[in-house]
Amino acid sequence: DEILHHCFKGCATQFSNYIAARSPKDFREFCIVYFSFWNENMNMLSILNKSGIMYRFASEFESLVLMMSSQTDPKANAKQKENSKYKYHFAYRTAGFWHVTELWCQEHPRKSPKEMADIMMEITSFPCGIQII
């Protein structure tokens, strides 16, 4: 367990640095960067998936996203945390995002990061185009 935790933490640090270096300006751009990172690290995702331990990375992923969101806009983040339902919204969103990643890594042929960004935009928008995430 400790070895896995160390590996996950190292990957999470790489992921965080990758996102920070690209500074996505909006949700679509974030999705492109996100799926580009995992596309470049597909071997690791495939190993996690084939060994049946990919689900264990989900909690590390949730912690990482929470940390990153607090760094990007502390004022907005503080307002969100004042909402008593914030933790439920956050858990729902990150779990959904991670599950999409799991499905995507199993695809052959795999969609490009831009195609996945388009899908994520569609998933997170109401029919009239209002962003829900």
PLM region descriptions:
Residues 1-24, 32-35, 39:
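An amphipathic alpha-helix adjacent to DNA-recognition modules
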Residues 14-21, 30, 92, 96-107:
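Solvent-exposed, amphipathic alpha-helical segments
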Residues 16, 20-23, 43-46, 50, ...:
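Short, flexible helix-adjacent loops and helix caps
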Residues 23-27, 50-54, 82-86, 109-116:
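Residue-level recognition of alpha-helical structural elements
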Residues 53-80, 84-99, 129:
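Amphipathic alpha-helical packing segments from all-alpha helical-bundle domains
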Residues 70, 87, 94-95, 99-133:
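C-terminal peripheral helix-coil segments that are non-catalytic and often amphipathic
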